[in-house]
């Protein structure tokens, strides 16, 4: 049915997996296709940390992270890393210890592919599947990892309330990490940045030139269709 509809359309906008995008490009009609998202969110040392953390939580917990535009990784500059971590924890996110991180690694990605059993599940359920005990009201599972290579399970699109968190020594390092994550599986999709827009104009310019994505967002949740002020004011 999908193939028949494509043949009748004047132009096709296809979002989904590789099969859907390939079908659109093979339809004989003009097509724009975007596959998987692997959205990195950079938190600069000039960012409003409360706004950044609450925006990411609102976005990542919407539909339990099923939206392909939702944040998959958070890259935090070293200067504010401890503050950001403290804020995530205070807002109900759970930081996995090294042993727990390894257990979740083996659950989120199996044989190189996303485990369908975690998609759209609550954080506590994913922890249970992994053999990890967390509070029932946990919002997001966060794994502190170093590698942005595709061999790192946390570097993949996860479509669930599971986040990778990276420490960047400076803004250039953060850009390098974000570029690599997008290359892992997010070309043409979404990238997000939290920064002081007045003092950080040069950084924003560099960011927009280096991120090979269609959606480049600044100081806003990446998956929510409507932004509300409680993202900043949530207590």
Residue positions per predicted region:
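A structured beta-alpha segment of the ubiquitous adenosine-cofactor-binding alpha/beta core
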Residues: 1-9
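A common structural junction motif
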Residues: 91-96, 182-186, 215
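Beta-strand->loop->alpha-helix junctions that form or flank phosphate-binding loops
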Residues: 96-102, 193-194, 216-224
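Short, well-ordered beta-strand elements within core beta-sheets of diverse protein domains
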Residues: 73-76, 159-169, 190-195
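ALDH superfamily catalytic-core signature
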Residues: 21-149
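Short glycine/threonine-rich loop-to-helix capping motif typified by GTGT followed
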Residues: 199-210
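Short, structured coil segments at secondary-structure junctions
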Residues: 8, 27-28, 211-212
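Conserved small/polar residues in nucleotide/adenosyl-binding loops
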Residues: 227-234
